[in-house]
Regions:
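Glycine-rich beta-strand-to-loop/alpha-helix junction loops that act as flexible
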Residues: 11-12, 90-95, 207-209, 325, ...
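Short beta-strand-loop/turn "lid" adjacent to the catalytic site in phosphate-handling enzymes
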Residues: 73-123, 144, 150-161
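Glycine-rich phosphate-binding loop of actin/hexokinase-like ATP-binding domains
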Residues: 151-254
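A mobile "lid/hinge" subdomain adjacent to the ATP/sugar-phosphate binding pocket shared
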Residues: 255-303
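Conserved phosphate-binding/catalytic loops in two-lobed NTP-binding clefts
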Residues: 339, 343-387
């Protein structure tokens, strides 16, 4: 049992995910989740060592959910008193222009997070529920907000600003905020350590159901694909990614769709799911290789071509912005586990001297690894992200 730890909380609209982290080793001492908050019957899972506890019980609100989390630590272990919690780190999606790093949660900081809810209406209100309850139930430890957008507050104006009327943009805080910043910062810093140099020109591909790209030069971000919201950029599991904004007006005029209907279409019914009916990449690959319906097979292959092509566009443009490229890193669920996506992108980059080691690329491992050949012009890494550890380390600065 460690004598010092950080409790990391990610509070969603109907869930609480948590992890007790040893910030020195990076080990998850215990972890779990509370799901279906507000439904007639909720679900709780707590993992400590080899012991897995699962329960179904009513969880009417986040207060009850957080109390159940603390109960499970008491009954199933580890005791939070023995774990020596030094801080509680809260994931917060949107920090706006206010936060370029982690922040000790005071009443003032809490109110600023609330003020930013219009920029992240699905996320910040849910984070606040978890923050308010956790501060009430654990008042004797520092609570720290770690923002997904903080890393990208360093973006140069040429990348952060849209070509929108300045007065309107400033009045309504319209600019590129990015997302997945905690992951992009963590991965790019760890790659710099592995390479033994800080003057790297890096592209980080955070590829999960939500996906984003960042260009990092000398440890600083110079561009990223997500924008005002996480909708912009790459094709994703259910999101369009980049799309002509006039499509919104077109659908309103010819289909009679409301703003909310277009929002739902773009965010929840598009991307891979919209083009193939499946949001999971494993299912899409299965359609490509095994589907008996030639039309479905072709739709899936076309969707994958669009996905790879969007990646290729961003890698190409970011390489130009960086003035060259030393490292490409794949991370998150698809980036870490989908060898075919990595191979197809690398093959598309072959004219620029990028060479993937086919055997190394096929190896499944939870460890950081190089999957390019020794003579590749760019080193390709697969690096497991660890946002919980990153949040824990940032929270620890206030302990």
């Amino acid at each position: 049992m460690t004598s010092s730890s950080v409790l990391v909380i990610n509070s969603g609209s109907s869930s609480i995910k948590y992890q007790l982290v040893d910030p020195e080793t990076g080990d998850a001492i215990a972890k779990g989740l509370v799901e279906r908050i507000g439904d007639p019957m909720g679900f709780i899972k707590h993992v400590y060592g080899d012991a897995v506890t699962e329960e179904e019980l009513p969880v009417p609100d986040h207060t009850v959910g957080m109390r159940e989390v603390l109960r499970l630590f008491d009954t199933e272990g580890p005791s939070l008193a023995e774990a020596g919690i030094l801080a509680v780190g809260h994931r917060v999606v949107q920090g706006g222009r206010y936060f370029d790093g982690p922040a000790l949660i005071t009443d003032e900081v809490r109110n600023l997070i609330e003020e930013l809810c219009p920029l992240a209406p699905l996320h910040n209100p849910a984070h606040l529920k978890g923050i308010d309850v956790a501060r009430e139930l654990m008042p004797d430890v520092p609570h720290v907000a770690v923002f997904d957008t903080a890393f990208f507050q360093q973006l140069p104006a040429r990348s952060a600003l849209y070509a929108l009327e300045t007065e309107t943009a400033e009045k309504y805080s319209v600019r590129r905020y990015g997302a997945h910043g905690t992951s992009h910062q963590f991965v790019s810093q760890e790659i710099a350590k592995l390479e033994g140099r800080d003057d790297l020109k890096q592209i980080v591909l955070h590829l999960g159901n939500g996906a984003s790209v960042s260009a990092v030069k000398n440890g600083k971000p110079i561009d990223t694909s997500m924008g005002l919201t996480p909708l912009e950029g790459l094709m994703m599991g259910t999101r369009t990614g980049d799309i002509d904004p006039a499509v919104v007006f077109h659908l309103q005029r010819v289909a009679g769709m409301s703003v909310d209907e277009v929002d739902t279409l773009f965010n929840k019914k598009s991307g891979m799911k919209g083009m193939t009916g499946e949001s999971d990449m494993r299912s899409v690959w299965d359609m490509i290789h095994n589907d008996d319906d030639p039309e479905a097979q072709q739709r899936a292959r076309t969707a994958m071509d669009v996905y790879i092509n969007r990646l290729l566009k961003y890698v190409g443009s970011y390489t130009a912005e960086l003035g060259g490229l030393d490292v490409i890193t794949f991370t998150a669920g698809i980036g870490e586990n989908d060898a075919a996506v990595r191979r197809e992108l690398a093959e598309a980059l072959a004219p620029f001297g990028v060479k993937i080691d086919v055997e190394a690329n096929q190896v499944r491992s939870g460890e950081p690894r190089v999957v390019s050949t020794p003579d590749s012009a760019v080193t390709i890494y697969v690096f497991p992200t660890n946002e919980e550890l990153a949040i824990a380390r940032q929270a620890l600065t206030f302990a």
